[in-house]
Amino acid sequence: MAPKAFFVCLPWVLPRHALIVRQAGNPYHFLAYTNPRAPGKLQDSHCPVFFMGIIIITIITVTLAIIIINIIFLTLFDDGMCFYCSLLTFSFVSFNFDHFDHFDL
């Protein structure tokens, strides 16, 4: 198994001793971890690795949501970006001061 496997270490995502193993001819990636009692041996956790796909899908979804929200606010309000930024930073005071000219005082 070891000569046919391709190992990629992801220490920032996976816990200690964890590796992603891809066997030759196998399209699926499986999570395996090194056995501290037997160095060089891999112990399969029998768990397909879906978390990388979930992370990528989450990043794409959040990015698209931010773009869509920006487009909506820019089309509904004349200075939509300022309004959207004030929503993000919760600086409603500066938003209100900037928009006094819209009201008849």
Swiss-Prot record:
Residues 1-48, 92-105 are extracellular. The chain crosses the membrane at residues 49-69, 71-91. It is found in: Membrane. Residues 70 are cytoplasmic. GO terms for cellular component: membrane. Its main location: membrane. Keywords: Membrane, Transmembrane, Transmembrane helix. It is a multi-pass membrane protein. Present with 521 molecules/cell in log phase SD medium. This is Uncharacterized membrane protein YIL054W.
